[in-house]
């Protein structure tokens, strides 16, 4: 199926279960964008491998399509792991967003609520993908990524994303 047909089917069957058509369209577009950065090997693994592998591939696709999330993973998650500081604190998020607001006019224009919502979303993504152990203490849980996936990401030149997930190993 083409992307437009997939989107049409998703909206027709309301698979995302949002109340408004606009929200369903938005989610469909985001998902198609994320799927678009995956090659056939990763799509096959996403569909047929373990739920853990699927979630790791989802994190990879989010990093590939969301620069701010990638920078968070690289500058905060990875660094916390390397420094053996295994908890993501509110302060970590605040410092990260402060630095980003100094680097980007767009980010600088955001209101506090935007940062709050982004923090919530990042925590939920990391928790649901088992990258943190719980949503309160936020203890970092280093994922066990299969050597097949690791080798593939290295071979396609995406080791920077692998390093962000694994702490630079």
Q: Would you name each region that the model predicts?
A:
Residues 1, 85-88:
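Short capping segments at the starts of secondary-structure elements
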Residues 1-56:
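Eukaryotic partner-binding/assembly regions in large regulatory complexes
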Residues 2-5, 64-70, 96-100:
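Helix-boundary capping/turn motifs
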Residues 19-22, 26, 64, 68, ...:
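Alpha-helix boundary/N-cap detector
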Residues 56-60, 64-86:
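Positively charged, polyanion-binding regions of nucleic-acid-associated proteins
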Residues 77, 81, 101-110:
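Long, low-complexity intrinsically disordered regions
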Residues 89-103:
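DNA-recognition alpha helix
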Residues 108-169:
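Accessory, usually C-terminal, subdomains that scaffold auxiliary metal cofactors
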